[in-house]
Amino acid sequence: MTMRIAIDAMGGDNAPDEIIAGTMESIQALAPDDRLILVGPADRINAQLENHEFDVDRVTVADAPEVIGMDEIPIESLRKKVKSSIAVLAKLAKRGQADAVISAGNTGACVAAFQMRMRNLPDVNRPGIAVVFPTFEGPVVVCDVGANIACKPINLYQYGIMASVYSKHILQVENPRIGLMSIGQEDAKGNEVVKKARELIRADSNINFIGNIEGRDILRGVCDVAVCDGFVGNVILKLTEGLVDGLFKAIKHELLAEKLRLAMKFKPVMTRIYKKYDYNEYGGAPLLGVNGTAVICHGASTAKTITNAILASKNFHTKKINHKIV
């Protein structure tokens, strides 16, 4: 089945070089009839493409002369920059010209544009960004990590359902355990939104709900899905990134301070562990709940991130995750 994947060439800190490089690298792993669409200023993209060898029938360019910066206000920027790469990306999906869209650009603008153009799945109130956290007990899906910072109980309940489907069919977890992020495991803990969400989740017999969880439980692998609002989820995500990076730097420093020979001995082990926790290996995070396949990547995405995001979007689309959610 032919798939058309549109990529925001101007999204992220390393655009367009790394985005285009990652797009080109993904070609070998895709089916011969899959097509890639690079969205952004045509002159800049075409100039970059001259550095790559590829089948011109497989990679096309959709001109989008404007770019939304990472620090711009999402709704306002989309209104002013109708020819921005994010806006054009969303339009391609709406018109049925792209089966999946990918961007490492302004997260708020991506969420707003994709939701506005692609619309939500039936009965889904608000979409949520689902990120996979690797643990030694298996992958944990955290949803939401930034799409919706002011959740209602129904939003958290629906995040649990959607992330559970994602965990089961993408990560192959047979009966995902769902935990609700709170400030304590006891039922009395948490604000009113969390308490009401817990009642909704617990009342659904189709959900394998284990109750409240705390921040430390995620990396312990206590659950397979952690549900929270976008504010809490984003703090957890950024804190974990910094923690992992700082921890590895500290270990590297201590090993080198001892003996270079000792450091070299542990290098393969450290490399394997670091790879396990490297977000570049996982590509992007799906925006669950929109009526289509949308993947949002880290702002610091490299070519490897984009390549993996493209492959992840194909997997999401091919396995018909949205059909399973509905």
What label would you give each PLM region?
Residues I7-D17, A147-Y157, I296-T302:
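Short, glycine-rich nucleotide/cofactor-binding loops
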Residues F54-A98:
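Phosphate/nucleotide-donor binding subsite
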Residues M1-R44:
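N-terminal phosphate-binding or glycine-rich loops at protein starts, especially the Walker A/P-loop
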Residues A15-I19, V82-G96, A100-F114, N125-I129, ...:
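Short glycine/serine/threonine-rich phosphate/pyrophosphate-binding segments
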Residues Q115-G128, V132-V142, V222-A226, G230-I325:
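Glycine-rich phosphate/nucleotide-binding loop
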